[in-house]
Amino acid sequence: MRFVVALVLLNVAAAGAVPLLATESVKQEEAGVRPSAGNVSTHPSLSQRPGGSTKSHPEPQTPKDSPSKSSAEAQTPEDTPNKSGAEAKTQKDSSNKSGAEAKTQKGSTSKSGSEAQTTKDSTSKSHPELQTPKDSTGKSGAEAQTPEDSPNRSGAEAKTQKDSPSKSGSEAQTTKDVPNKSGADGQTPKDGSSKSGAEDQTPKDVPNKSGAEKQTPKDGSNKSGAEEQGPIDGPSKSGAEEQTSKDSPNKVVPEQPSRKDHSKPISNPSDNKELPKADTNQLADKGKLSPHAFKTESGEETDLISPPQEEVKSSEPTEDVEPKEAEDDDTGPEEGSPPKEEKEKMSGSASSENREGTLSDSTGSEKDDLYPNGSGNGSAESSHFFAYLVTAAILVAVLYIAHHNKRKIIAFVLEGKRSKVTRRPKASDYQRLDQKS
């Protein structure tokens, strides 16, 4: 039965991974250009809770310190073993092999199939798989592989590690800190549990590798293969998959990744369009624009802004302060109409300057969004250009030779026509020869 379950899981994962292989390589090249470091900016439409919980498309997830039940089973976090494909494998310093089995890391076993795995402080959920690594990249292919520095052995047997034994089948697993129960029983995690439709993976400090899933490293680049990546401080949520990270979750409508200090090829032009509108509305009411409001509304654009644009931002608050001081000076004298007119003029000039600043920032961010696409498409265009260049060179060479040898070519063609006429006598000629003889 164990082998059958493992084979079924392998087939399901292979079927899901095949259509994503084409797009994964291109996006990995594009996303791998920039390393990520720094803070994660949140999308304006993202709903965040103080504990860092995410809502998923099919199922909700519970926040930081609350346990939840999964669709098939509730799962245990950091120091509890999970079962994979009816098999739980535990290890501390052993590396894992991939077969059709899930492999566990330092203090936990990962569970594949229809079982979910939770991390230390966060919960994650994905359509086929959810990966919630703390400082690691996620890897699955119908298999949860969770190595730290050590080999993991595969088989149809449950393997025990230094501190925690794991039981396979429908048996309860007891670990160092928390007992893990399988079946339809609820499992109590240390800090939180997550729900998953198919699979949740919860490595602590371990890299997971995926054939069809994104990797979410702490200081590494985000890669997407039609999947969302959730870094440490901002997990992203997509219609197909969601990956959650350490503290705070992000919701993204189909394939909008959250990033740290680098952008992904996919951008939200709608955000850039809606941003100036929201800013102009605020300017009409207040006559000024706070940089914090712009940062929160722009969401991901804060990470994309280049140093010159940051200087533009820093100049904007000073421009706002000057009109305020002028307005305060104008309020001193008790003259009626002249101060009011001056206030209106100053507020109008400040609003126009802020509008220009926001427009320049939005256009700059749009350009920054286009740069990764340009760099990604540059290789493809260069390859196409090379092909066109080769074909053009061949055509030029042929035409050049034909032009200088046109007399020979014409003579050859004419000789061929004449030879056909002479070498093919008609049937009537044969009949005449027969009659004469």
Swiss-Prot record:
Protein name, entry field: Trans-Golgi network integral membrane protein 2
Coiled coil: none
Region listing for 14 X 14 AA tandem repeats, in residue ranges: 54-249
Residues recorded with modification Phosphothreonine: 302
Locus of motif Endocytosis signal: 395-398, 418-421, 430-433
The gene coding this protein: TGOLN2
Bias kind Polar residues: ranges: 38-55, 63-83, 166-177
Region feature Disordered, mapped onto this chain: 27-377
Organism per entry: Homo sapiens (Human)
Protein origin, superkingdom: Eukaryota
Residue spans crossing the bilayer: 382-402
Pfam families with a match to the protein in the record: KCT2
Sequence repeat residues: 54-67, 68-81, 82-95, 96-109, 110-123, 124-137, 138-151, 152-165, 166-179, 180-193, 194-207, 208-221, 222-234, 235-249
Localization terms from the record: Cell membrane; Golgi apparatus, trans-Golgi network membrane
Gene Ontology CC annotations of this record: clathrin-coated endocytic vesicle membrane; endoplasmic reticulum lumen; endosome; Golgi apparatus; nucleoplasm; plasma membrane; trans-Golgi network; trans-Golgi network transport vesicle
Tissue-wise expression: Isoform TGN46 is widely expressed. Isoform TGN51 is more abundant in fetal lung and kidney. Isoform TGN48 is barely expressed in embryonic kidney and promyelocytic cells.
Function text: May be involved in regulating membrane traffic to and from trans-Golgi network.
Cytoplasmic side: 403-437
Positions annotated as glycosylated: 39, 82, 96, 152, 180, 208, 222, 373, 377
Residues with the Phosphoserine modification: 71, 221, 298, 351
Residue spans, topological domain Extracellular: 22-381
Low complexity bias locations: 105-114
Feature: compositional bias, Basic and acidic residues: 197-221, 239-249, 310-324, 337-346, 353-370
